[in-house]
Amino acid sequence: MMTQYKLQLEATNFTKQQLQQQLDILEQNNILQIALAGRSNVGKSSLINALAGRKQLAKTSGTPGKTRSINFYAVYPNTFMLVDLPGYGYAQCSKIERQHWAMLIEYYLKNCSKLKAFVLLIDCRIPPQKLDYELAEFATSYCIPLIPVLTKIDKCKLVEQNKRQKEWRALLNNTQPLLVSSKNMKGVQQLWERIQYTIDSY
């Protein structure tokens, strides 16, 4: 039986100034954070909804690049934050907009002292991509524990899932990616357990 968690959207930040104000508040109240990031159209909003057990907490869209801000979701009864970072790698938006999203992500990772893990979402259907690997390297360079997650496994055969796990395990110093589907909920409880274990370690 799945553990029940309640998620509530607490804040949305579009600028570096807004983000710093939010980080200051969380720092003062000693609120721990778990960040989620991934390429545009990786299924991040759908996964947040699956984690929450709700359909429209995070807005989903067939158009990549839906998340254009940093969104903070309070998790109850444990009282920590899931932080939804903007999707990256969406070629159809302007270069300036892509640079702004990258700046927000980098600023957050560099300045959040309460960030306890970085959940990197990776599309199971495609081979390892440079942007995903670079973001994983960036997070680990700041000593942020990495939780790699292969999404959309309901669209991949088992042999392909195993292949992707092996590829990423080789790239991430033998860290085993979780296999998750927001559609059939496979792996969602395991992801919650990994997140909870990380929070309980502090």
UniProtKB/Swiss-Prot annotation:
Residues 30-201 form the EngB-type G domain. The keyword Hydrolase does not apply. One of its GO terms (cellular component) is cytosol. One of its GO terms (molecular function) is GTP binding. Its cofactor is Mg(2+). GTP binds at residues 38-45, 65-69, 84-87, 151-154, 180-182. It holds the Pfam family MMR_HSR1. Keywords: Cell cycle, Cell division, GTP-binding, Magnesium, Metal-binding, Nucleotide-binding, Septation. Gene3D superfamilies: P-loop containing nucleotide triphosphate hydrolases (3.40.50.300). Mg(2+) binds at S45, T67. The keyword rRNA processing does not apply. InterPro entries: G_ENGB_dom, GTP-bd, GTP-bd_ribosome_bio_YsxC, P-loop_NTPase, Small_GTP-bd. One of its GO terms (biological process) is division septum assembly. SUPFAM superfamilies: P-loop containing nucleoside triphosphate hydrolases. Necessary for normal cell division and for the maintenance of normal septation. Belongs to the TRAFAC class TrmE-Era-EngA-EngB-Septin-like GTPase superfamily. EngB GTPase family. HAMAP family: GTPase_EngB. This is Probable GTP-binding protein EngB. The gene is engB.
